[in-house]
Amino acid sequence: MSYYQWRVFARDVTVCCVGSVAMGLLLAAAADMAMPKKAQARPSELRMIERTVERAAGTRVLWAKGRTNGCTKSTLLGFYAPDKNTVIMCESNLRNSLPMAIELIKHEGWHAVQFRCNKGRPVLRDDQLRNGMRRKDKAILREAYPKHQHRLEAEARTVSQLPTQHYLAGVEAYCRYRT
């Protein structure tokens, strides 16, 4: 294509450059929204739990927005992936509930402690689990989990109810000699 007027040429180049930059920014924004993030602007209690799990258990904590990184069901709030040694928090499904996010990161973080610091075994005794679990958690356990996962899941549900300082002390204690 040949141009006979410099203005037409300049306009076409400008349109092409602006379009390319706009498309690049749009793709970058879309990719940024889809990628899991480290907790940034989160309340200090949540950040403290996250940092302790990452440091003591050596487990990454990622925050997934939307239906990415395994957060495909709207009912899934988060999970621990032992094969990737990662806790995934399904941020969009938590509905901006700080208490729910805190309890969940404690729960999933404790699964990391069980696997990374205690060889995949629970720490609490059966009587502690029975006395510490809420009635609704006992029902969920029976309905939604295979029997071989009951003790680990019961312990994570029980430990997630602890005050944060006690939870953090437990993580530190059980991961002190992690190999």
What kind of feature is each model-predicted range?
Residues 32-57:
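Short N-terminal segments immediately surrounding and downstream of signal-peptide cleavage
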Residues 68-99, 115-116:
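Active-site scaffold of zinc-dependent metalloenzymes
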Residues 2-17:
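N-terminal Sec-pathway targeting helices
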Residues 98-113:
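Short alpha-helix carrying the canonical HExxH Zn2+-binding catalytic motif
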Residues 109-125:
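Catalytic Zn2+-binding segment of zinc metalloproteases
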